[in-house]
C-alpha cells in the first residue's frame, strides 16, 4: 500500500510518500510544493493543485493522510491553510483516493509515543523510523512523512 502524507500550507506544502508492505514501512520520496507570496491566492491554489495532481499521477498512492487544522492565532492564515487543504481534498476525491485526517496530537503520539512532542523530537523519530541518513528537509516534508507514518501504522494493509 502506498500512502501520501500532506502537511498543508499555501506558501510551503510538505508531502511524503511511504510504502507499506505487510509490517514493513519504507520511504519512497518527500518534498515540498512552494508558492510565491506576490502571486494572487487563486493562482497559488491552482499551482498547488496542479503539482499535487502530478504527484498523484506519478506515485499512484492508495491513500492520502493529511494533518487537520489546529488552532491558529491569525485567522487569515487559518483560512488560507484551509483553502490549501481543500485543494488536496478535491484532488484526492476526484481520483477516488481515500483520505484520512489526523490531528497534530495524533501524529506526534503515533511517531514519538508522546502527543506533546516538539518538532525536533518528531523529526528525529521520522529519521529513525524510516532508517534515513538525515532528518528530512525542509521541516514541512518531515511533518508530511510523520502524517503518512501515522496512517501507515493505523491502517490494515
Curated annotation (Swiss-Prot):
What does this gene product do? Answer: The RuvA-RuvB-RuvC complex processes Holliday junction (HJ) DNA during genetic recombination and DNA repair. Endonuclease that resolves HJ intermediates. Cleaves cruciform DNA by making single-stranded nicks across the HJ at symmetrical positions within the homologous arms, yielding a 5'-phosphate and a 3'-hydroxyl group; requires a central core of homology in the junction. The consensus cleavage sequence is 5'-(A/T)TT(C/G)-3'. Cleavage occurs on the 3'-side of the TT dinucleotide at the point of strand exchange.
Q: Where in the cell is it found?
A: Cytoplasm
Q: Which GO-annotated molecular functions does the record name?
A: crossover junction DNA endonuclease activity; DNA binding; magnesium ion binding
* Cofactor mode of binding and number, as noted: Binds 2 Mg(2+) ion per subunit.
Protein residues bound to Mg(2+) 1: 7, 140
Q: Which cofactor does it need?
A: Mg(2+)
Catalytic residues identified in the record? 7, 67, 140
Which Enzyme Commission numbers does its entry carry? Answer: 3.1.21.10
- Give the UniProt record's GO annotations in the biological process aspect: DNA recombination; DNA repair
- The organism named in the record is Thermosipho africanus (strain TCF52B)
Q: Which residues bind Mg(2+) 2?
A: 67
Official protein name in the record: Crossover junction endodeoxyribonuclease RuvC
The reaction(s) this protein catalyses: Endonucleolytic cleavage at a junction such as a reciprocal single-stranded crossover between two homologous DNA duplexes (Holliday junction)
* Gene3D superfamilies to which the protein is assigned, alphabetical: Ribonuclease H-like superfamily/Ribonuclease H
- Keywords associated with the record: Cytoplasm, DNA damage, DNA recombination, DNA repair, DNA-binding, Endonuclease, Hydrolase, Magnesium, Metal-binding, Nuclease
* Assembly and oligomerization: Homodimer which binds Holliday junction (HJ) DNA. The HJ becomes 2-fold symmetrical on binding to RuvC with unstacked arms; it has a different conformation from HJ DNA in complex with RuvA. In the full resolvosome a probable DNA-RuvA(4)-RuvB(12)-RuvC(2) complex forms which resolves the HJ.
Q: Which SUPFAM superfamilies match?
A: Ribonuclease H-like
Amino acid at each position: 500500500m502506498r500512502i501520501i502524507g500532506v502537511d498543508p500550507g499555501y506558501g510551503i506544502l510538505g508531502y511524503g510518500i511511504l510504502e507499506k508492505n505487510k509490517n514493513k514501512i519504507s520511504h519512497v520520496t518527500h518534498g515540498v510544493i512552494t508558492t510565491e507570496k506576490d502571486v494572487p491566492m487563486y493562482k497559488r491554489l491552482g499551482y498547488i493543485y496542479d503539482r499535487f495532481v502530478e504527484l498523484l499521477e506519478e506515485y499512484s498512492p492508495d491513500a492520502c493522510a493529511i494533518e487537520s487544522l489546529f488552532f491558529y492565532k491569525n485567522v487569515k492564515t487559518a483560512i488560507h491553510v484551509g483553502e490549501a487543504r481543500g485543494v488536496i481534498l478535491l484532488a484526492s476525491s476526484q481520483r477516488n483516493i481515500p483520505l484520512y485526517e489526523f490531528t497534530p496530537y495524533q501524529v506526534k503520539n503515533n511517531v514519538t509515543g508522546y502527543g506533546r512532542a516538539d518538532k525536533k523530537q518528531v523529526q528525529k523519530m521520522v529519521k529513525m523510523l524510516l532508517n534515513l541518513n538525515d532528518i528530512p528537509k525542509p521541516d514541512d516534508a518531515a511533518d508530511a512523512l510523520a502524517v503518512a507514518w501515522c496512517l501507515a501504522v493505523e491502517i490494515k494493509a
